[in-house]
């Protein structure tokens, strides 16, 4: 009887590991079906006690694996652009831009996970699936990300994603009007405007 219980536990562990692997593979396969897209988004940031910290909206352009333009239009404008080599962050209000190497950007942030869709990045997470909804938990608790959830259709359309930090703060993004089409290359280039202070960390 004891041997049977041990065998059942072992088999259950194998099935669970297989399910996690299948969920991760399915998520990667779905994301890989759309190589470039444009969408508008809304943002809602809440604290651990549910209080609204910030609400905003903006536009997003992506061309996988390493090109993206994240343009927050409200409440305050900011731009995050990758040209494939350099990651640019621009804040028009304070007239400051920061440049860092994209290769040094961490792969454990939700946005980098979505835009890169790199198998090595996904290996750092346990992935559970329920229909179109995927829940990711970091295998290492050393980072600031506690949990990440994303909803993706079988055709590769991202409907929403949510990041929960270790302190309980939740950032939820809902994508709408997503268009899977070729994005103009100019969306992925950035030149600091005249008068802007550049913090070049490359």
UniProtKB/Swiss-Prot annotation:
Cystine pairs: none
Signal peptide: 1-21
Presence of keyword Cell wall biogenesis/degradation: no
Cellular component aspect of the GO annotation: outer membrane-bounded periplasmic space
Pfam families to which the protein is assigned, alphabetical: LolA
Keywords: Chaperone, Periplasm, Protein transport, Signal, Transport
Subcellular localization, as worded in the UniProt entry: Periplasm
Domain of life the protein comes from: Bacteria
Entry-linked InterPro entries: LolA/LolB/LppX (IPR029046), OM_lipoprot_carrier_LolA-like (IPR004564), OM_lipoprot_carrier_LolA_Pbac (IPR018323)
Main location: periplasm
GO biological process: lipoprotein localization to outer membrane; lipoprotein transport
CDD domains from the UniProt entry: LolA
Function: Participates in the translocation of lipoproteins from the inner membrane to the outer membrane. Only forms a complex with a lipoprotein if the residue after the N-terminal Cys is not an aspartate (The Asp acts as a targeting signal to indicate that the lipoprotein should stay in the inner membrane).
PANTHER family reported in the protein's UniProt record: OUTER-MEMBRANE LIPOPROTEIN CARRIER PROTEIN
Quaternary state and interactors: Monomer.
Protein family membership: Belongs to the LolA family.
Name of this protein: Outer-membrane lipoprotein carrier protein
Organism annotation: Yersinia pestis
